[in-house]
């Protein structure tokens, strides 16, 4: 029995075409470039090599480079006004409100970013929990620890949750634990993906029984 819908935040609850996530990625690489003294392109290369070991750039920097000033990182990556392009989404609100299943957000971003985005979209009150990367010692998706923390927080078993994310790597991490996960692939970038996939959020109703 489905007891919870667990949503990623960025590029899942709003379209990737707003460009917010691209700007976040750019600021991450710029921050790491300044920190390490190497070009952003080299940061990107090293980060991609370490992607399977570290789900987030922050975890990579903390583990491999001994980085500790987490709040400086978040301040640089998530500046004021970063979500100004977003507007209240009344259609999304009506859709989510019409699903009679509790909903939560699981994000690799800090809580203040999640609050900002959800407030801009006008859907903050529709989620019982916002589970952010700070709550699990900065271990993010697809780390087992983060998923298990989310399940404990929600008080459910993994087979009672449907997880939706726009990153195959993160969905596959949830699937590997025995969960049910759906990839939101808005522009069909992952045409060879063999697990359940949707192009827009409204299609999740096919998987809610």
Go through each PLM region and give its residues.
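Catalytic-core regions built around general acid/base machinery
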Residues: 91-100
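Alpha-helix boundary/capping residues
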Residues: 50, 77-80, 99, 121, ...
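Residue-level marker of regulatory loop/turn positions in helix-turn-helix DNA-binding domains and
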Residues: 84, 88, 106, 139
């Amino acid at each position: 029995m489905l007891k919870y819908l667990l949503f990623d935040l960025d590029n899942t609850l709003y379209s990737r075409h707003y460009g917010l996530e691209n700007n976040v990625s750019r600021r991450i690489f710029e921050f790491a470039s300044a920190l390490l003294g190497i070009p952003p392109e080299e940061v990107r290369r090293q980060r991609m090599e370490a992607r399977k070991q570290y789900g987030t750039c922050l975890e990579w920097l903390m583990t491999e480079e001994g980085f500790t000033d987490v709040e400086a990182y978040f301040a640089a990556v998530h500046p004021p006004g970063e979500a100004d392009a977003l507007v209240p989404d009344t259609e999304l609100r009506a859709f989510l409100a019409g699903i009679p299943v509790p909903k939560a957000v699981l994000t690799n971003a800090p809580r203040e970013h999640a609050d900002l985005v959800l407030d801009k979209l006008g859907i903050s009150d529709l989620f019982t929990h916002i589970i952010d990367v700070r709550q699990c010692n900065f271990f993010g998706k697809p780390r087992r620890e983060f998923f298990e923390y989310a399940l404990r927080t929600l008080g459910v078993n993994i087979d009672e949750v449907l997880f939706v994310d726009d990153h195959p790597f993160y969905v596959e991490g949830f699937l590997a634990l025995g969960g049910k996960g759906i990839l939101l692939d808005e522009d069909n970038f992952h045409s060879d993906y063999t697990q359940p996939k949707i192009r827009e959020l409204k299609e999740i109703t096919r998987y809610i029984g």
